[in-house]
């Protein structure tokens, strides 16, 4: 949940959906 991306892809080790921290 720490890795953020504008593409809404799973980047962190937990597999949390990123895309909110742009």
Curated annotation (Swiss-Prot):
Name this protein carries in UniProt: C-type natriuretic peptide
Gene this chain is encoded by: NPPC
Pfam families linked: ANP
InterPro entries: Natr_peptide (IPR000663), Natr_peptide_CS (IPR030480), Natriuretic_peptide_brain (IPR002408)
Main location: secreted
Disulfide bonds: 6-22
Molecular function in Gene Ontology: hormone activity
Record-level GO BP terms: blood vessel diameter maintenance; cGMP biosynthetic process; growth plate cartilage chondrocyte differentiation; growth plate cartilage chondrocyte proliferation; receptor guanylyl cyclase signaling pathway
Keywords noted in UniProt: Disulfide bond, Hormone, Secreted, Vasoactive
Source organism of the structure: Gallus gallus (Chicken)
Intracellular or extracellular location(s): Secreted
Function: Hormone which plays a role in endochondral ossification through regulation of cartilaginous growth plate chondrocytes proliferation and differentiation. May also be vasoactive and natriuretic. Specifically binds and stimulates the cGMP production of the NPR2 receptor. Binds the clearance receptor NPR3.
Cellular compartments per GO CC: extracellular region
Family indicated by similarity: Belongs to the natriuretic peptide family.
Organism classification: Eukaryota, Metazoa, Chordata, Craniata, Vertebrata
């Amino acid at each position: 949940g720490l890795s953020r991306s504008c593409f809404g892809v799973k980047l962190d080790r937990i597999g949390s959906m990123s895309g909110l921290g742009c």
